[in-house]
């Protein structure tokens, strides 16, 4: 009888953060593709675009003028998804038609005044300032809201509506679905194992190495064993850290370096500005000790085979179970094979 080989045979991998299984089909990786293709952005963007709503000194669609900022710039989203003064929804006991009020705020963070430079093209010093801004915003909003979601949608393929490099910060009066699930499952693991799930996971990955993409003094980026997206990564501190606000100065500056190395490898993989959605998850601000939590960032990039061919989460993925072709180990190997110095900086 043929012996099972995870490189050749379909199998399922369990994601302990979500409680869901992922179908891995490595034998499909060589199938021909005649479907839709993305059009990668080839144009060279200017350092300042007079028509951009996010550039320094420009007027936004609301008529508000941006200051002549020189570092990061944060403002309340002109089209915020959440409002702080939402009235209470009427109480409902209908099990099929439940509703509750959602309060919060939505902010935009411009990473720098340079319209042309995404995260991997910024200096480590500039990236350190971005991390510091994430910390400050999280600390401020965490005084009012239990959940603060820092995230970035990079590229038109991920629905980004403005090419000026920026991220967003949403704060919620509730624990969103993904956060609630991670909170519950990490708490269950902690009760059973007497240690934080992702602290244990970092040690396993450090010992294994096959899924490692970037390692610095304080940080580790891996294609997680249970990755759903082709080149998905999980960025974690090596030490136990509950929230981004708890980082030491050394961890913060080293995180900037890790972010530059990781995002540079992404861009270098297909020699393009690699699209992704990324965001931070940390312990909620709920007044509890939350020792089961470990700070981490998820990177979800859609590209699969090239700068023009992406992964679609449709059909079986929507109706049954998430499926991927490349194994996590194969994806990590491909990311390790490219330089962590951005191709535009290296002159390639």
From Swiss-Prot:
Zn(2+) binds at residues 52, 55, 115, 164. GO terms for biological process: galactose catabolic process via UDP-galactose, Leloir pathway. Gene3D superfamilies: HIT-like. One of its GO terms (molecular function) is galactokinase activity. The keyword Transferase applies. Changing residue 182 to A: Decreases enzyme activity by about 50%. Abolishes iron binding, but has no effect on zinc binding. The keyword Transferase applies. InterPro entries: GalP_UDPtransf1 (IPR001937), GalP_UDPtransf1_His-AS (IPR019779), GalP_Utransf_C (IPR005850), GalP_Utransf_N (IPR005849), HIT-like_sf (IPR036265). Pathway: Carbohydrate metabolism; galactose metabolism. It comes from the Bacteria. Its EC number is 2.7.7.12. Keywords: Carbohydrate metabolism, Galactose metabolism, Iron, Metal-binding, Nucleotidyltransferase, Transferase, Zinc. UDP-alpha-D-glucose binds at residues 28-31, 61, 77-78, 153, 159-161, 168, 311-312, 316-317, 323. GO terms for cellular component: cytoplasm; cytosol. It catalyses: alpha-D-galactose 1-phosphate + UDP-alpha-D-glucose = alpha-D-glucose 1-phosphate + UDP-alpha-D-galactose. It holds the Pfam family GalP_UDP_transf. Homodimer. Iron binding is not required for protein folding or enzyme activity. Belongs to the galactose-1-phosphate uridylyltransferase type 1 family. This is Galactose-1-phosphate uridylyltransferase.
């Amino acid at each position: 009888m043929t012996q099972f080989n995870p490189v050749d045979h379909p199998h399922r991998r369990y994601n302990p953060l979500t409680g869901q299984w992922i179908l891995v089909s490595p034998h499909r990786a060589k199938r021909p593709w005649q479907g839709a293709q993305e059009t990668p952005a080839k144009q060279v963007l200017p350092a300042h675009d007079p028509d951009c709503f996010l550039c320094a000194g420009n007027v936004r669609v609301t008529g508000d003028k941006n200051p002549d900022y020189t570092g990061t710039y944060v403002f309340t989203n002109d089209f915020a998804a959440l409002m702080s003064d939402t009235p209470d929804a009427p109480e409902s006991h209908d099990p099929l038609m439940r509703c509750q009020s959602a309060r919060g705020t939505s902010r935009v963070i411009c990473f720098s005044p340079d319209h042309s430079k995404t995260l991997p093209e910024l200096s480590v010093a500039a990236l350190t300032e971005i991390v510091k801004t994430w910390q400050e915003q999280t600390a401020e909003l965490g005084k009012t809201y239990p959940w603060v979601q820092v995230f970035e949608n990079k590229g038109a393929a991920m629905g980004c509506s403005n090419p000026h490099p920026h991220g967003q910060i949403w704060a919620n009066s509730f624990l969103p679905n993904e956060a609630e699930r991670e909170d519950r499952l990490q708490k269950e693991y902690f009760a059973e194992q007497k240690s934080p799930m992702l602290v244990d996971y970092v040690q396993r990955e450090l010992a294994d190495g096959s899924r490692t993409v970037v390692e610095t003094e304080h940080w580790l980026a891996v294609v997680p064993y249970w990755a759903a997206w082709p080149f998905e990564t999980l960025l974690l501190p090596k030490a136990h850290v509950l929230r981004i606000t708890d980082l030491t100065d050394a961890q913060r500056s080293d995180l900037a370096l890790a972010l530059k190395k990781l995002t540079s490898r992404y861009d270098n993989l297909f020699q393009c500005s690699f699209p992704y959605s990324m965001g931070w998850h940390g312990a909620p601000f709920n007044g509890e000790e939350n020792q089961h939590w470990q700070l981490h960032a998820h990177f979800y990039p859609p590209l699969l085979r090239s700068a023009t061919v992406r992964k679609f989460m449709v059909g079986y993925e929507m109706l049954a179970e998430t499926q991927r072709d490349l194994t996590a180990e194969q994806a990590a190997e491909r990311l390790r094979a490219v330089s962590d110095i951005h191709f535009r900086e290296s002159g390639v």
